[in-house]
Curated annotation (Swiss-Prot):
Chain intervals for the UniProt region annotation (Disordered): 1-23
Annotated function: Required for rescue of stalled ribosomes mediated by trans-translation. Binds to transfer-messenger RNA (tmRNA), required for stable association of tmRNA with ribosomes. tmRNA and SmpB together mimic tRNA shape, replacing the anticodon stem-loop with SmpB. tmRNA is encoded by the ssrA gene; the 2 termini fold to resemble tRNA(Ala) and it encodes a 'tag peptide', a short internal open reading frame. During trans-translation Ala-aminoacylated tmRNA acts like a tRNA, entering the A-site of stalled ribosomes, displacing the stalled mRNA.
InterPro entries in UniProt: SmpB, SsrA-bd_prot, SsrA-bd_prot_CS
Family: Belongs to the SmpB family.
Organism listed in the record: Thermobifida fusca (strain YX)
Name recorded for this polypeptide: SsrA-binding protein
GO biological process annotation, one example: trans-translation
Phylogenetic classification of the source organism: Bacteria, Bacillati, Actinomycetota, Actinomycetes, Streptosporangiales
Gene3D superfamilies: 2.40.280.10
One GO cellular component, as annotated: cytosol
Gene Ontology molecular function: RNA binding
Compartment(s): Cytoplasm
Keywords: Cytoplasm, RNA-binding
Amino acid sequence: MARKKKQDKGQGPKTIAQNRRARHDYHIEDTYEAGLVLTGTEVKSLRAGRASLVDGFAQIKNGEVWLHNVHIPEYTMGTWTNHAPRRPRKLLLHREEIAKLDAKTREAGRTLVPLSLYFRNGRAKVEIALARGKREYDKRHDIAEREAKREMERALRRRR
């Protein structure tokens, strides 16, 4: 009898939510992939593609990393077992990574922000970044660079 093939849960990561605002408001210094400790209704809500990372941030307390202000709406088919949409969620990282992040976030002006939320091999993951806040003139400078690049590309297209 032939063996059954193991069902593939998807080739690459299935992105649920991205925090575009973080890349605009912060200088991203380093990124880390962390697992999430979730309840059943949170996973079902994420599988439906519903989440918002806009106001999210991560904090280190007692050697554990916690994700705050990430909105995962209640599962529509859930009953009294539904979760609180903005509850703090524990992130799973290696001890060495937590120690390194703790040392770096103690420096002035550094924070941990979520960049994206996705499923990898059936497990919910969040990409967090060690970031430093941008000032208003930094944001304007980035916008000016982007506009100059667009103008250059337009000019090249017209020449062809």
